[in-house]
C-alpha cells in the first residue's frame, strides 16, 4: 500500500492537471455496484498479485481515488512530485509508457465515459474557420490604401484590388440584374464579393430580430444552484491553507512601519469624535431683527380699493340716475358686462339711506382677491440718461471745419437761390430772383461782373472741368451757357474755340430741346449758347467730366429729366415713363449712374444698361435736396419735414442714419470734395456742419458727428438758407439766403 502511494505521488506530475481536475465534474453519479472490470486494479493495489508493477498501481489508484483524495494527491504531488521528476526523468518516462499500456489493456467504463465527454480540446476552437486567403494578419487595412494590393495569400503572392471601383451605375445594374444582390457582401480582406449561404442569412435574420445565433440555445433553462439552501456539515472544499499564509507579509510590514513613522511625525491625526447632536443652518442668522427694511423687504402692499364716484353718492346728480329704459337694459346684461355693479339711487337725506345689501358679498370678494391673486413687484430700471447718448469724439479732435463767418457778399436785391464755385476755388457765381447773375472773387468778396439774364435764376452750376471756363444757369424755360472769361485767358479762349468748332449736321435730328446761338449783344455779356426746353427749368447739374449736363423740368411725364451733350449739342430723355414728380438729379462721381430724387424715393439708374439698380426709401414726406459722397458709396437727402437722411449704398436701401437737428425745412445739402464734411441749410436760418467719415473698411460703419451750427442769415418771408456749397480745396462753406446775401464761413 505504501508502495502504491509512493508510486502514485511520483506519477502525479506526469498527468495533465486540467484532466485530473475536470474528472470529478464530468464523472457521472456513482452507482451502487461498480463494474467488474474496474475491480481488478483495486486488488492489484493491495499487493495480492505480485505480477503487477508499482507504476500500474499508482496509475489506477490515481484514476480511481480522484474523486475522494484528489486534493491530498494534488498537494502531495506539488511538494514531492517535483523532486521526483527532477531526480529520475527516465523512471517517469517508464511510468507513462506503463500507464498507456494499462489503459489500453484494461478499459474501464468510467474512464471511457470521461474521455468521451472531454473529447478533443480543439473541438471548440474556431480559429480554423477564419478566412486565411489574406495572410496579412490582424492589421488595419487602411495601411494598404496607397498600394495596388490588399495583402498576401498563403503562397506569398499579392492580392490585388479590383481594377475599377464600382460606381452608383454599376450598383444599380447589379441590383436590377443579379437576383443574389441582396445576399452579396464585400469582403474587406480581399475586396471580393461573397454570397451568403442560407444558414448565414438565417443567422443574420435571427440577430436582427434580437434572437440568439444558435438555434438550439435555450436562454430559459431551469437554473440549478451550486450552493443549496441547506447548511452542510462538510465544507465545499477542504484544501489546507498555504504555507505562505502563516508567514508575516513583508509588504504589510513596510506599510505598518510607514504608518508608525507618520503617526510619530504628526502627519496622521486621529479622527475627531463627531458631535451626535444635530446641527441646523440658521437662515436668518445675518438678519437684524430690529431693522424695519429687513422685516418688510419682500412685503408687497395690497392694491387699494377704488374711491367712490358721483354715482355712489346718496344724492347723485340727475345725469347719473338711470332712466327706465336704461334700468331695463342694465338688468338684462350679464353681471360681468355691466359698467356699474349697482343702481344709483337718490335719497333726500343721509339718514334715509338704508343698509348696503352687497356689503358682505363685496367684503368676501375683497378677501378672495387679497389671498388668491398673486402680487408682482415691478422692477424699475434706473438708466442714466448719459448712457443713452452714443459716445462721440469731441469736435475739437475733428478739425478742420468752418467755425465762424468770414465774409459777406452783398449786392443782390432779392433772395439768392443758388451758388456755385469754380474748380480752382477762386471765383463764385450766384443767382438771384432779381434777374441777375453775379460773379464774385472769393478772397475779397468783390463783385467782378453782373450778368442780367431777364428772369429768376433757379439754378447755377460751374463746369467741373478745369480746362473749360463755362457756367450753366437755369432761367425760366432755358439753360444759359456763359463764358465768364475769368482766370486764365487761355482757358477762356479754348472754351470759345470748343463751342465754335461745332458743325451742325445737314439734317438736324428731332430733339426735346433747341440749341440756339447767342446774339452779338449777348456774346458781349458772356452768353454763348441758349438751350430752350419750353418748360420751366428747376435744376441744372454737370457730369464730372464736364461734357454732359442734366436738367430737371417742372412738367409731367417722362420728359422731366433731360441730358444734354455739349460737344455734339444733342439732347435726349433717358426715361420712358415717370415715377412721380422729380425734385433733384445728380451724377455718380465714379460710375455711369444717375440718381433721381422724387418726392418719396431716390432711384439709382445705370445709364449704360438702361435699368434701375436701386430704390432708396428716405421715409420722408417730401425730398428737397440731394448730394452724393465723392467716393460714391453714400448719399444724403434733405426733406421739407426737417430731416437729413444718410444712405449707405453698400449696406441697405433703408436709411443708415436720420438726423433731425434742424427745426424747419431743409433747402440744400452738400458734401465737401476732399474733407470728411457735409452741411445742410434750413429755413431756420442756420447751417449745420457735420463730420462724416467714411472708412475704407467695409465692416466699419460711417462716423457721423455734428460739429458746428453756423448762423448769420436773417429770416425773410419765412425763408432762411436757400443753398449751401463747399469750397473745393479749403474747409470753407458758402451759404446763400433769403436776405439777399452770400456768406462765407471759415
Curated annotation (Swiss-Prot):
**What would be one Gene Ontology cellular-component term for the protein?**
chromosome
**Full protein name:** Ribosome biogenesis protein BOP1
Question: Acidic residues composition bias: which ranges?
Answer: 66-87
Q: What's the gene?
A: BOP1
**What are the entry keywords?**
Nucleus, Phosphoprotein, Repeat, Ribosome biogenesis, rRNA processing, WD repeat
Regions of biased composition (Basic and acidic residues) lie at 88-99
Pfam short name (any one): BOP1NT
* Subcellular location per the Swiss-Prot or TrEMBL entry: Nucleus, Nucleolus; Nucleus, Nucleoplasm
Q: What is this protein's function?
A: Component of the PeBoW complex, which is required for maturation of 28S and 5.8S ribosomal RNAs and formation of the 60S ribosome.
Q: Which organism is it from?
A: Homo sapiens (Human)
Amino acid at each position: 500500500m505504501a508502495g502504491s502511494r509512493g508510486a502514485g505521488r511520483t506519477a502525479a506530475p506526469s498527468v495533465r492537471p486540467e484532466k485530473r481536475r475536470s474528472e470529478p465534474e464530468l464523472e457521472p453519479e456513482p452507482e451502487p455496484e461498480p463494474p467488474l472490470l474496474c475491480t481488478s486494479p483495486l486488488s492489484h493495489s493491495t499487493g495480492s498479485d505480485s505480477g503487477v508493477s508499482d507504476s500500474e498501481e499508482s496509475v489506477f489508484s490515481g484514476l480511481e481515488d480522484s474523486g475522494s483524495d484528489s486534493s491530498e494527491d494534488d498537494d502531495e504531488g506539488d511538494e514531492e512530485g517535483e523532486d521526483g521528476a527532477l531526480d529520475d526523468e527516465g523512471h517517469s518516462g517508464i511510468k507513462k509508457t506503463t500507464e498507456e499500456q494499462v489503459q489500453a489493456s484494461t478499459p474501464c467504463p468510467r474512464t471511457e465515459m470521461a474521455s468521451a465527454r472531454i473529447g478533443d480540446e480543439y473541438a471548440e476552437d474556431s480559429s480554423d474557420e477564419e478566412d486565411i486567403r489574406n495572410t496579412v494578419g490582424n492589421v488595419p487595412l487602411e495601411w494598404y490604401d496607397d498600394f495596388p494590393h490588399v495583402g498576401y495569400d498563403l503562397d506569398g503572392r499579392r492580392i490585388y484590388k479590383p481594377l475599377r471601383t464600382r460606381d452608383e451605375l454599376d450598383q444599380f445594374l447589379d441590383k436590377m440584374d443579379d437576383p443574389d444582390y441582396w445576399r452579396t457582401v464585400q469582403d474587406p480582406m480581399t475586396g471580393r464579393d461573397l454570397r451568403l449561404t442560407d444558414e448565414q442569412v438565417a443567422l443574420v435574420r435571427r440577430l436582427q430580430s434580437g434572437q440568439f445565433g444558435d438555434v438550439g440555445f435555450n436562454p430559459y433553462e431551469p437554473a440549478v444552484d451550486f450552493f443549496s439552501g441547506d447548511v452542510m456539515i462538510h465544507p465545499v472544499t477542504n484544501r489546507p491553507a498555504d504555507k505562505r499564509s502563516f508567514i508575516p507579509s513583508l509588504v504589510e510590514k513596510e506599510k505598518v512601519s510607514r504608518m508608525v513613522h507618520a503617526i510619530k511625525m504628526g502627519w496622521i491625526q486621529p479622527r475627531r469624535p463627531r458631535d451626535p447632536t444635530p446641527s441646523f443652518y440658521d437662515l436668518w442668522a445675518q438678519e437684524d431683527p430690529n431693522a424695519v427694511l429687513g422685516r418688510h423687504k419682500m412685503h408687497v402692499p395690497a392694491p387699494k380699493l377704488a374711491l367712490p364716484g358721483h354715482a355712489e353718492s346718496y344724492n347723485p346728480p340727475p345725469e347719473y340716475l338711470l332712466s327706465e329704459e336704461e334700468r331695463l337694459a342694465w338688468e338684462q346684461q350679464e353681471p360681468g358686462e355691466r359698467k356699474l355693479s349697482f343702481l344709483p339711487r337718490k335719497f333726500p337725506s343721509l339718514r334715509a339711506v338704508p343698509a348696503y345689501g352687497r356689503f358682505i358679498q363685496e367684503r368676501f370678494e375683497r378677501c378672495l382677491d387679497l389671498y388668491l391673486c398673486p402680487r408682482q413687484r415691478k422692477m424699475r430700471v434706473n438708466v442714466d440718461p448719459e448712457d443713452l447718448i452714443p459716445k462721440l469724439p469731441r469736435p475739437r479732435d475733428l478739425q478742420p471745419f468752418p467755425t465762424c463767418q468770414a465774409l459777406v457778399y452783398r449786392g443782390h436785391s432779392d433772395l439768392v437761390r443758388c451758388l456755385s464755385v469754380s474748380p480752382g476755388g477762386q471765383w463764385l457765381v450766384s443767382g438771384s430772383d432779381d434777374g441777375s447773375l453775379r460773379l464774385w472773387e472769393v478772397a475779397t468778396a468783390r463783385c467782378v461782373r453782373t450778368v442780367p439774364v431777364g428772369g429768376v435764376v433757379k439754378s447755377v452750376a460751374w463746369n467741373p472741368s478745369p480746362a473749360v471756363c463755362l457756367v450753366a444757369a437755369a432761367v425760366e424755360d432755358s439753360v444759359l451757357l456763359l463764358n465768364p472769361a475769368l482766370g486764365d485767358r487761355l482757358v477762356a479762349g479754348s472754351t470759345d474755340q470748343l463751342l465754335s468748332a461745332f458743325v451742325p449736321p445737314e439734317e438736324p435730328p428731332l430733339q426735346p430741346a433747341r440749341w440756339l446761338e447767342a446774339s452779338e449783344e449777348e456774346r458781349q455779356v458772356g452768353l454763348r449758347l441758349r438751350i430752350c426746353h419750353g418748360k420751366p427749368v428747376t435744376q441744372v447739374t454737370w457730369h464730372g467730366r464736364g461734357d454732359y449736363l442734366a436738367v430737371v423740368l417742372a412738367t409731367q411725364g417722362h420728359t422731366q429729366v433731360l441730358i444734354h451733350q455739349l460737344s455734339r449739342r444733342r439732347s435726349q430723355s433717358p426715361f420712358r415713363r415717370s415715377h412721380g414728380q422729380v425734385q433733384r438729379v445728380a451724377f455718380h462721381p465714379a460710375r455711369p449712374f444717375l440718381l433721381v430724387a422724387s418726392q418719396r424715393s431716390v432711384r439709382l439708374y445705370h445709364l449704360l444698361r438702361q435699368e434701375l439698380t436701386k430704390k432708396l426709401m428716405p421715409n420722408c414726406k417730401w425730398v428737397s435736396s440731394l448730394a452724393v459722397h465723392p467716393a460714391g458709396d453714400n448719399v444724403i437727402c434733405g426733406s421739407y419735414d426737417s430731416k437729413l437722411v444718410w444712405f449707405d449704398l453698400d449696406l441697405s436701401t433703408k436709411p443708415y442714419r436720420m438726423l433731425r437737428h434742424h427745426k424747419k425745412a431743409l433747402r440744400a445739402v452738400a458734401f465737401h470734395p476732399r474733407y470728411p464734411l457735409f452741411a445742410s441749410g434750413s429755413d431756420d436760418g442756420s447751417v449745420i456742419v457735420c463730420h462724416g467719415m467714411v472708412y475704407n473698411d467695409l465692416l466699419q460703419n460711417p462716423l457721423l458727428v455734428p460739429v458746428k451750427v453756423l448762423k448769420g442769415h436773417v429770416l425773410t418771408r419765412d425763408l432762411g438758407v436757400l443753398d449751401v456749397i463747399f469750397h473745393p480745396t479749403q474747409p470753407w462753406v458758402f451759404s446763400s439766403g433769403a436776405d439777399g446775401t452770400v456768406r462765407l464761413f471759415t
